[in-house]
Amino acid sequence: MDWNGTSADGYTGVDVVKGMLDITSNPAFMAVADGDMSNQLASGNLAACVSGTWDAITAKEIFGDGYAATKLPTFTVGDKQVQQGSVAGYKYVGVNGYSENSGWAVLLAEYLTNEESQQMFFDQRESGPSNKNVAASDSVQENVALAALAAQSEYAQAQKVGGKYWDPAKTFGELIAQGTLSADDDNAIQEALDNLVEGAAASVE
């Protein structure tokens, strides 16, 4: 969907950014740097957070009996409620068949992806297992964070971005999170969107 143009539902990129600014201007909102969510949870400053399953164990420890997880909420765009989307991805374990030690590489790949290792990764980090037997276990099926991730997956798009995407996206996110943009300045919002698209679409050198 081209949020820098006009969506099939009639929303423009400017409309969406205004909705985002409405969230970040709320005094209850706190922008948390990448990798710092666990520290902020431990500080007791957060009543809720938007994060991934990698922070589930910390959140469970901090919130105790009050711990819960769900899909992302809707937010206001114009006069309507719009479901927040997300990106979804996965990681391959690949082996270079031309490697000098390709045999050992295959053994390592088999070890990382086998049932025992995938169970261990889930037990220690609550990461979604790729092994079918582990994924079908009661502990995985009943996991609160993974259930929330599954619910959000209906609104997620596969992550297909180039290497030039991340820096412009970070800059754009900081403009919103820090309140640099004003919801009353359509031109400045559109310029920020144009810069984001231009940077993300730049050729990889």
Role assignments for model-derived ranges:
Residues M1-D2, V87-V95, W166-A177:
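Periplasmic solute-binding protein
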Residues L21-A28, N45, A59-F63, L112-E116, ...:
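Sec/Tat-exported extracytoplasmic proteins
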Residues A150-E205:
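Conserved C-terminal helix/tail region of periplasmic/extracytoplasmic solute-binding proteins
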